[in-house]
Every structure is written in structure tokens, then in C-alpha cells.
Amino acid sequence: MSRVCELTGVSVQSGHNVSHSQRKTKRKFLPNLQNVSLFSDSLKKAFKFKVVARAIRTLDKVGGLDCYLLSASDKILSKFAIEVKKIIKNNGSKSS
């Protein structure tokens, strides 16, 4: 099970716990991943994604799943998100 956000690409980071005596021990910073169903307005359908809490806030700010996917770069999106993006693009071109 991979700990990567499907919409933003945020993943596990590594660092140190630092004690009072300045000893450093390795640790991991885990992303705040949530399993959510996101609704596509153009397709009238919900899709399940594993996303970080910050991405959910960004989706609300941008105006929904469709707007976010169309403006996002394919480099940061997962394979499933890219497929959904293509479906949304094709659906938009048919309705125009």
C-alpha cells in the first residue's frame, strides 16, 4: 500500500527526531491521507481517490474535481487520475 496522494503527489518524507541533547534519530513524516469519493460535475459520477487533507481544501478552493484535474499537470497525477482527466476532457469536447 503506497502512501502517496493521487492528486498532488505528496508522499512520505524522512527526517530526524532531535532530543534536548541534540541526538538525531531517523523518523518518517507521513502524509495525512484520506480515502474520499469525489464527485465529477461534468460526468455526474463519483470517483474514489486517496488524497491528503490539503488536496481536499485545494479542490474546494479551485471549484471541484473537474477544474482541478484540467488545470493540474500530468506529472503529479496518478495513472487513475490521468484516466479520469482524459474522460472529462473527452466528455467536455462532445458536449460543446
Swiss-Prot record:
| Keyword vocabulary terms for this entry | Ribonucleoprotein, Ribosomal protein
Residue spans making up a coiled coil are none
Instruction: Please verify whether the record's keywords include Ribonucleoprotein.
Output: yes
Q: Does the keyword Ribonucleoprotein apply?
A: yes
Q: Name one Pfam family in it.
A: Ribosomal_L28
A GO molecular-function annotation: structural constituent of ribosome
Q: Which family does it belong to?
A: Belongs to the bacterial ribosomal protein bL28 family.
Protein known as: Large ribosomal subunit protein bL28
Q: Which organism is it from?
A: Orientia tsutsugamushi (strain Boryong)
